């Protein structure tokens, strides 16, 4: 009646004692950590994971922050949640049980996780559009914002990772449990509105990519792309396809190289990077809100909490949090560097010639100094790859938030008939986004204003991160440090101030 089903890899078995006359039961000795020991005393089915290190390709693939990557992590994480309340001896036992990387490359891969790849994946198709429009419209004027947003982005993402690691819960579930359902509903609504707009923008971006390649209107690609992504996300393990599109999305790294050969005025670039230049015109303010929203967005807040919750890291809590900080720093710096050079590149090639970005082809012109006539094809490939990777993540984060708000079972590792509510939310969000994408809204304007909306909504979630991260009942002795708190407060003030200036411009008719 009270038996527990175990799956024990052979490498975890240390000795086997068969039945004797005096002892009717045999004895199997296995290596387990303190966390696993506690889990074995709980009800339900558990699984002891193999100590053997994954091969390099498998290890790398499990770090990819796609819906499929999260599905794999969910399947692995059957051991009970770890907690900051573990005693030091338990942490030491966990450290002893954890396998050591065999090479420097494996060590790097063991650190790289949701933080790095969320930072890089944050440069989705709509974000690329926002950065390109900013560079083409404002030149080098907002480069200082990219520098300022880097430590702020680090603070926000680190706080989210720490919350996920310590609580082993999703953000919406934490808010519902400790602050009530109304607070959780508000946070989920913020995320839903932002994500639906971003998914619509990314669908349009993918369609625009196909338009550059085929010459057919982007409009005809939206429904097939949405249907294919829904099917792959819900029903299929699209591991091979995922690898291809991740590689395609790296095409935007070409902006870094192009910026170097674009003839940019590097003296002006350096001045504009370190000396803030604030322009209170509506076009400049709205563009500033867009790039802030593209950098620190609602979905990355929810996704970082969920990703760190699912990420397996060896060692005691202090080491896990330190590894998460390094992971996030790598992602934030890499992602913001790409965004920085996109602005430099478009400023040096489009702004200086008084050009504008009205279509995807206009945005592709920024790559022509390096790539010539093939620029539009590489840009199209990048748009398609970035969009295909981002949309499932946006949909999944929406489903996790709503499911956590109402206490529904959630997880991509379960089949649709086992998780009807979770997959219904995902489907409804995609249908609404598809309808918005089909509404004949100007594609470039949709890309831009989706990120403006992100910038307006993000401060609400930053406040929630502050509240949760400093709540003793939730975080125990692992509350956020003073530097992280300062970063969160400054992030809130900067983004909120930009949003207020945007609203002032709209109310005074500057946006018309």
Predicted segments — roles?
Residues 118, 145-179, 186-197:
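Juxtamembrane transmembrane-helix boundary signature
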Residues 188-189, 213-235, 251-256, 420-432, ...:
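Transmembrane alpha-helical segments of multi-pass small-molecule transport proteins
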Residues 162, 166-167, 184-215, 222-226, ...:
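Hydrophobic transmembrane alpha-helices that form the core helical bundles
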Residues 91-96, 130-135, 158-183, 208-210, ...:
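Flexible loop linkers connecting adjacent transmembrane helices
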